[in-house]
Amino acid sequence: MSELKYKRALIKLSGEALAGDKKFGIDPETVSNICREIAEVLEMGLQVSLVIGGGNIFRGLSSSAKGMDRSSADYMGMLATVLNAVAVQDALEKLGHATRVLSAITMQEVCEPYIRRRAERHLEKGRVVICAAGTGNPYFTTDTAAALRGMELKCDVIIKATKVDGVYDKDPMQHDDAVMYRQLSYIEVLQKNLRVMDSTAISLCMENNVPIIVCNMYKGGIKRAVMGEDVGTIVQGG
């Protein structure tokens, strides 16, 4: 068995990733492909918790900018993350991996409530834990939820799995001359306003000294990251 550098990881996925080329909604084939990448590290013995955004269905911040009440918009965004969580749960279980969705907003007919100790027990038993509905509070992003759950569940690393290979000085989708950073400090991310995660999430990771690895969700990026290989961009240290 390949050597893991980390025992427990929180993987953050954007909601948009689940839409594939459709840009909106959930594409089952794309979800299955992403889950196959996650299954690879599960089979290596990694304990995995997931936080998934909801931007493929509803984005609270942009809706509030268009006149909707911010709290109402954020709650709608949180509900969107539950839809995504159930879709990923279904795909992972089809691959043979027991998965539990734990929601910060109680909806007992659909998923379990998020209780930290319960989540830890699931992880210890080898189940995937998907933390849904953000923090359960408006004004907090799913990036912040990922950082918070990562701390609560004592994860060794937070992996932000994206469509690109790491963190760049500018958008690589729009600029061919974009340069990828191999390593950054938390302070550099904040000072340069790099779009790794929002500032609240970065600050939480900095205060608790939890590294963030930004890598491609495909190309075996997640597997290489948890093995400690030089992949993507790592954010750590002062």
From Swiss-Prot:
Reactions it catalyzes: UMP + ATP = UDP + ADP
CDD domains on file = AAK_UMPK-PyrH-Ec (cd04254)
Looking up Gene3D superfamilies in the UniProt record yields: Acetylglutamate kinase-like (3.40.1160.10)
Keywords linked to the UniProt accession: ATP-binding, Cytoplasm, Kinase, Nucleotide-binding, Pyrimidine biosynthesis, Transferase
Q: What is its main location?
A: cytoplasm
A single GO cellular-component term from the record reads: cytoplasm
Q: Which SUPFAM superfamilies match?
A: Carbamate kinase-like
Q: Where in the cell is it found?
A: Cytoplasm
Protein residues bound to ATP: 12-15, 55, 59, 162, 168, 171
- What pathway does the annotation place this protein in? Pyrimidine metabolism; CTP biosynthesis via de novo pathway; UDP from UMP (UMPK route): step 1/1
EC numbers for this chain = 2.7.4.22
**Gene Ontology biological-process entries:** 'de novo' CTP biosynthetic process; UDP biosynthetic process
User: HAMAP family recorded for this chain?
Assistant: PyrH_B
- Name the job this protein performs: Catalyzes the reversible phosphorylation of UMP to UDP.
Subunit composition? Homohexamer.
* Protein name stated in the entry: Uridylate kinase
Q: Which organism is it from?
A: Oleidesulfovibrio alaskensis (strain ATCC BAA-1058 / DSM 17464 / G20)
Q: Upper lineage ranks? A: Bacteria, Pseudomonadati, Thermodesulfobacteriota, Desulfovibrionia, Desulfovibrionales
